[in-house]
């Protein structure tokens, strides 16, 4: 019996040593596996930032209707140029100073966007906006030629055609007009032709597109963040919202797939001046890049159609509102149109649009105070030094253009609307990363020239035919925070036919 007990005791010691070894190795492996995350958490805890709730972090800020105001007016003063926030259990470093932002956005090692953008895959697909760094590099190289200036020149006729329809809609809408829906219809019609390649609708009415999958769907990003278990697709796809999103993406896929099949059909049209939509361009170039799949074409079309509508539409509507609010600048820009066109009622050319310097200053100032994209995210590909801080590799960084655009040491009277901020004499002395309306660096908005030409074409057409005034009782626009910034309840303007000395 004593022999058995001795053997048992010896075995117990061996088992105990074995268990200790397993525990030690497990702990060691855990720390090895998550050493970067532990380093990040340790760094995050050393930073200043707004008070955070356990497990929820600062997610409640996302639903604060005054968030944009607080971020633009008080964040820098309260927390400085570098601080931390928590979105549920996920930490982020916020940087506001342009020279620090340049170290992130201007460095090709930091082009990865991180998990926040992954939550948009179900809605936008994996296009240039949301894709990982390697996919982005490949797609950007392939798509870039489609946005060269000589290609964009052929799209200006499409911009002008839809702009004429928008003016007709404005003039027939009455004194108090919610311009938001009409502007969105106009932008959609432009994108429907230039991105997808659908034929324009004849007549003077804007395209009725309420049933299009490109005008439907709901972005669930912030809802999922406020319900952390829904960050995981396994759980999210079992919810009603997840099922609706999947159904919506199926409709988007089908619409793009049908157009791709149509584009592949033989075409005898040899007109060299014919516009080539982005979808047609990608279908043609696919044979040169075998790694560029049909699914990639669909994802890119979804990205440009869905993201382009929100950003361009909201900016045009806000710019028109600002013209109503600042009649002196409205007169300045109308006079600029008169100098360019004289008594000629023709549509603008590329040269005309590029000559609209005052209009461009006005649009840029609108986008400075009201950027359509409220945040830019990156994941660091290596450690970087910002001020006294060494921010570790793998850390998620957020940039808030709304805050950076209102730094008093970069903009005189930063909270005041003043298009002279973009007078070339002032702009040349300003840090290039102090203005982020189209992001900046290698992963900036590929369609920024397209968007600016589209906006100038549409807005100039409106100014030449319409006098814009504020509607009593609707002199303020309340913005709401989404993936893009939108006007809550719409934007209302009084539209009066402009008296002209020439045939319009």
Where are these regions (language model features)?
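Conserved cytochrome P450 K-helix/beta-meander segment immediately N-terminal to the heme-binding cysteine loop
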Residues: 110, 399-426
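Conserved cytochrome P450 K-helix E-x-x-R motif and the immediately C-terminal K′/meander segment
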Residues: 59-80, 254, 258, 347-387
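Cytochrome P450 heme-binding "Cys pocket" and the immediately downstream C-terminal segment
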Residues: 201, 327-329, 448-485
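Conserved cytochrome P450 catalytic core segment spanning the I/J/K helices
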Residues: 60, 148-150, 188, 225, ...
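Cytochrome P450
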Residues: 2-27, 86-93, 150-161, 171-193, ...
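N-terminal membrane-proximal hinge/A-helix region immediately C-terminal to the signal-anchor transmembrane segment
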Residues: 2-138, 153, 157-168, 382, ...
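Cytochrome P450 heme-thiolate "Cys pocket" and heme-binding signature region
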Residues: 124, 307, 425-455, 478-482
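Central I-helix of cytochrome P450 enzymes
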Residues: 187, 191, 249-256, 285-339, ...
């Amino acid at each position: 019996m004593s022999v058995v007990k001795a053997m048992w005791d010896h075995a117990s010691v061996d088992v105990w040593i074995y268990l200790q070894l397993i525990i030690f190795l497990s702990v060691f492996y855990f720390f090895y596996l998550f050493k970067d995350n532990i380093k990040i958490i340790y760094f995050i805890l050393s930073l200043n930032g707004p008070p955070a709730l356990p497990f929820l972090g600062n997610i409640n800020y996302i639903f604060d209707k005054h968030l944009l105001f607080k971020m633009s007016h008080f964040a820098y003063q309260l927390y400085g140029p570098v601080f931390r926030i928590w979105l549920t259990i996920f930490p982020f470093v916020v940087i506001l100073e342009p020279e620090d932002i340049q170290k992130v956005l201007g460095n090709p090692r930091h082009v990865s966007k991180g998990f926040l953008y992954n939550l948009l895959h179900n809605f936008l697909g994996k296009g240039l906006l949301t894709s990982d760094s390697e996919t982005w590099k490949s797609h950007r190289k392939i798509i870039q030629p489609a946005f060269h200036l000589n290609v964009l020149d052929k799209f200006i006729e499409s911009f002008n055609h839809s702009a004429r329809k928008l003016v007709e809609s404005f003039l027939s809408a009455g004194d108090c007009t919610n311009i938001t829906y009409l502007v969105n219809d106009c932008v959609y019609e432009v994108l429907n032709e230039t991105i997808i390649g659908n034929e324009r609708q004849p007549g003077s009415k804007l395209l009725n597109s309420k049933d299009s999958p490109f005008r439907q769907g709901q972005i669930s990003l912030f809802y999922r963040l406020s319900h952390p278990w829904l960050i995981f697709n396994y759980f999210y796809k079992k919810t009603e919202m997840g099922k609706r999103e999947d159904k919506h993406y199926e409709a988007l896929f089908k619409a793009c797939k049908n157009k791709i099949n149509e584009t592949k059909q033989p075409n005898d049209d040899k007109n060299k001046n014919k516009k080539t939509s982005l979808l047609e361009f990608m279908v043609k170039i696919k044979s040169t890049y075998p790694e560029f799949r049909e699914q990639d074409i669909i994802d890119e079309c979804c990205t440009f159609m869905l993201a382009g509508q929100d950003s361009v539409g909201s900016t045009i509507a806000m710019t028109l509102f600002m013209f109503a609010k600042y009649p002196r600048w409205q007169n300045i820009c109308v006079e600029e149109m008169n100098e360019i066109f004289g008594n000629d009622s023709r549509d603008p050319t590329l040269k005309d649009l590029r000559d609209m310097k005052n209009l461009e200053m006005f649009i840029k100032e609108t986008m400075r105070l009201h950027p359509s994209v409220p945040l830019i995210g990156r994941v660091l590909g290596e450690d970087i030094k910002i001020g006294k801080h060494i921010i570790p590799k793998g850390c998620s960084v957020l940039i808030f253009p709304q805050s950076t655009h209102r730094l008093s040491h970069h903009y005189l009277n930063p909270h005041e609307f003043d298009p002279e901020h973009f007078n070339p004499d002032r702009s040349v002395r300003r840090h290039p990363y102090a203005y982020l309306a189209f992001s900046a660096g290698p992963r900036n908005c590929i369609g920024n020239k397209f968007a600016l030409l589209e906006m100038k074409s549409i807005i100039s057409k409106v100014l030449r035919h319409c006098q814009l005034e504020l509607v009593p009782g609707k002199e303020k626009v309340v913005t709401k925070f989404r993936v893009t910034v939108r006007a809550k309840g719409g934007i209302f303007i009084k539209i009066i036919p402009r008296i002209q000395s020439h045939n319009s």
